[in-house]
């Protein structure tokens, strides 16, 4: 177990230090995990989340068709016409991303909203880095709001046998949706404060962008609808969402070819698929698979349980804040999967309702990824988009938004859940 922890920690230090080489560092570390036997060859495919990888590939290609149609430019014009200055343009985009992310996967949300943000920044001639970071962290926050917003929410809903409406009203009380929205309200104020110096007025638009093709927009909206519908299908294949995104990209490419009559025109959307972002995620999945196989996550869960002792409030507090810390560095899906049965056992031993512990786990694990640029797939995707546009995201750029945003969101949720379900 110790070698796995050392390799994992060293890899993260290198990725934070040499941000331009993150994909190569992560892939190299993943290969080392395999070669040393810490991740057996037979477990490699199981460690890779093909659903996320296919979603990113499919949505990236589809979004390129969306961009080429000029629809993001038109949406940018609409947003710019409604807000007074750059500050509120950034806040409104983050809030809009959050609303979408409550029903659609976080990564897909970032890929869909980022083109609109980039277009606004081009028109305003301002740096898009904080805009995209704001969109990414807002997407991560709202993933816990509904049953369909994030994989961890689906896992928790399954463990507690919760319906879609149970996320709004549970055990005769307002449920976790309102904890998330309370955090969203305060974190929006944090974003407004972070962007407080961006008071430049929005210039009056002298012309309105003309959309060249509405089919990519229909396909993108269709993607959202199908992803929502798929979330209600019981026992569906793990790669369902990824296949939906890739299938709609295929439809878009076929339509594009039928429209232009040139196969070469199909290359643009395919070239837009960011292989470096996908490579980074592959490396991270292999690393996480390695530490999971070596028992690191199980040991971390056991330590949390021991640290909580027999006091429900102490246990709740430890679970929330340790989940924030752990999820800042490792994918929250294997962590949550490990902690769900641990919490069930603890609740049985203590003879208490496990609801506050489960809700604390979900809120902490979901928001923890916002603390670091590589703590969540949505963050990695957003940074990848910026890199392709020629922008470098320093760790400090992310920390100054991600960390205060996380604490502004988690503190009210922490208090809310305990007051309603712990006392």
Question: In which residue ranges do the predicted regions lie?
Answer:
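Transmembrane alpha-helix interface/packing and boundary motifs in multi-pass membrane proteins
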Residues: 13-20, 96-105, 136-148, 321-335, ...
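Membrane-core helix-loop-helix motifs of multi-pass transport proteins
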Residues: 120-217, 353, 380-415, 423
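Hydrophobic alpha-helical transmembrane segments
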Residues: 1-7, 39-42, 83, 115-132, ...
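Hydrophobic residues within alpha-helical transmembrane segments
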Residues: 6, 28-31, 50, 59, ...
